[in-house]
């Protein structure tokens, strides 16, 4: 019963949070963004005391069910482990302290020292976010585009095509390597990653030792058949000595389900004898129901591209991102420092951005940190999706009115790239598309009536949305680009 309830809850959580990363329509984040905000590390970074305390209390009562049900990377390992069809494939192994605790120490040092790349690399939720965003979402979009093409031939527009492109090759490689490592570890040893590398698993293991409900042996009923140990994906059951390493147990229920002699119980205390066990039988179904109720209640509480516009003025070739002195971060991130200190690199904002403005940074100093660039779209003033889904408080929630008054950067004009000068043609795309009215066209030479019109930028009114940079027909470098601000301003 415990195993079935765990599998149902884990399946629901995993499917929903995966859909949250895959969704490019903007419809699911209103309903599912709370799933990201109940993840342990994002809640810590957001100083969400309610969620952190709730998860710790959940661990103190039920054990490490966070790792077994809520964490998408943990459930994903269970999915990968199923590719190894061999039954009774696990065995007991001692905890790997020499690796487990040093990894946690490095993780904490990276968090305190602000070494974002290392912190994001080890964070479990962020690791799954990278895999979902960099690998799963492009495949999902490709499938959608195939359906859109088929539907269009049938005069149906139930689907629409979306662009797929490589947001960051280094981050894609990191995601692919992570996926391969997870597959090998899960295929060979189940939850090896959770109990040797994952810092969240190590933190929760300290509390799981003292959980109220645990897996206990009834030594009178145990036949030492080893089936429990062979089905324990955490490799934490020493059947010979009738002991369970509760710091590694993820309360999956596999051991109870595989035991034919009723020698394992999920209860608040160990059975002392056969007589006491028979006199007071342990009703695991009630505890399983309690577990399910707690998870459902906790979930309920947590919930309270346009085409290139070249105008025929330039060849259709890909734009090259300018070398910005200060990276652009989304409105609501307050400053680059605040964003870098709080971001866990889960890439949820990247996957949710409807205009594909956000992408993981390829800069070694800020690798995997989402930054903005305008080769594929601009940041629409009315869109606040990234601030709504950010689980770590790196992007504070802003409404449409507030966003329109936040200056994340300002536009800079590059004379040598501007087509009215280089090609002697009229343009004005940047001025026509500026939502803030911060650009007007003025003659290059006021004394010449035939002088080409060039953009004049009012930096005080510019909000840094990038509409001008995106629609600029100059290739490969735009004649106008947005330079970021270290600290965002209100205008």
How does the language model describe each region?
Residues 1-242, 247-248, 253-491:
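Non-ligating segments of multi-cofactor redox enzymes
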């Amino acid at each position: 019963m415990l195993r079935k309830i765990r599998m149902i809850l884990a399946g629901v959580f995993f499917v929903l949070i995966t859909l949250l990363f895959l969704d490019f329509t903007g419809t699911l984040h209103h309903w599912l963004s709370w799933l990201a905000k109940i993840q342990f590390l994002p809640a810590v970074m957001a100083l969400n005391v309610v969620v952190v305390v709730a998860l710790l209390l959940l661990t103190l009562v039920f054990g490490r069910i966070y790792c077994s049900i809520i964490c998408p990377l943990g459930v994903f390992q269970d999915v990968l482990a199923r590719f190894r069809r061999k039954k009774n494939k696990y065995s007991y192994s001692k905890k790997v302290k020499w690796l487990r605790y040093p990894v946690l120490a490095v993780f904490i040092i990276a968090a305190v020292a602000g070494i974002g790349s290392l912190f994001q690399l080890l964070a479990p939720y962020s690791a799954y976010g990278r895999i979902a965003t960099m690998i799963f979402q492009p495949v999902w979009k490709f499938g959608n585009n195939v359906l859109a093409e088929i539907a269009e031939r049938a005069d149906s527009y139930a689907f629409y095509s979306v662009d797929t492109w490589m947001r960051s090759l280094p981050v894609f490689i990191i995601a692919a390597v992570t996926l391969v490592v997870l597959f090998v570890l899960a295929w060979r040893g189940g939850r090896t990653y959770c109990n040797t590398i994952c810092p969240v698993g190590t933190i929760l293991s300290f509390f799981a030792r003292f959980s109220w409900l645990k897996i206990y042996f009834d030594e009178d009923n145990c036949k030492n058949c080893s089936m429990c140990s062979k089905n324990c994906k955490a490799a934490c059951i020493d059947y010979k000595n009738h002991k369970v390493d509760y710091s590694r147990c993820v309360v999956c229920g596999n051991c109870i389900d595989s035991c034919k002699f009723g020698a394992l119980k999920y209860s608040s205390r160990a059975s002392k004898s056969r007589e006491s066990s028979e006199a007071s039988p342990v009703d695991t179904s009630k505890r399983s129901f309690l577990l399910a109720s707690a998870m459902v209640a906790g979930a309920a509480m947590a919930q309270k591209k346009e085409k290139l516009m070249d105008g025929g003025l330039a060849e259709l070739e890909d734009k090259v991102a300018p070398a910005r002195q200060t990276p652009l971060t989304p409105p609501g991130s307050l400053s680059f420092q605040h964003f870098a200190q709080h971001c866990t690199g889960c890439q949820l904002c990247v996957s949710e951005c409807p205009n594909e403005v956000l992408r993981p940074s390829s800069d070694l100093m800020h690798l995997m940190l989402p930054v903005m660039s305008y080769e594929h779209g601009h940041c629409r003033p009315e869109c606040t999706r990234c601030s709504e889904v950010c689980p770590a408080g790196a992007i504070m929630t802003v409404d449409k009115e507030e966003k329109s008054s936040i200056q994340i950067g300002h536009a800079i004009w590059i004379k040598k790239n501007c087509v009215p000068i280089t090609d002697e043609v009229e343009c004005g795309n940047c001025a026509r598309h500026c939502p803030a009215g911060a650009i007007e066209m003025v003659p290059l030479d006021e004394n010449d009536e035939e002088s080409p019109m060039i953009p004049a930028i009012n930096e005080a009114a510019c909000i840094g949305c990038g509409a001008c940079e995106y629609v600029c027909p100059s290739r490969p470098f735009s004649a106008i680009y947005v330079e970021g601000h270290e600290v965002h301003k209100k205008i």
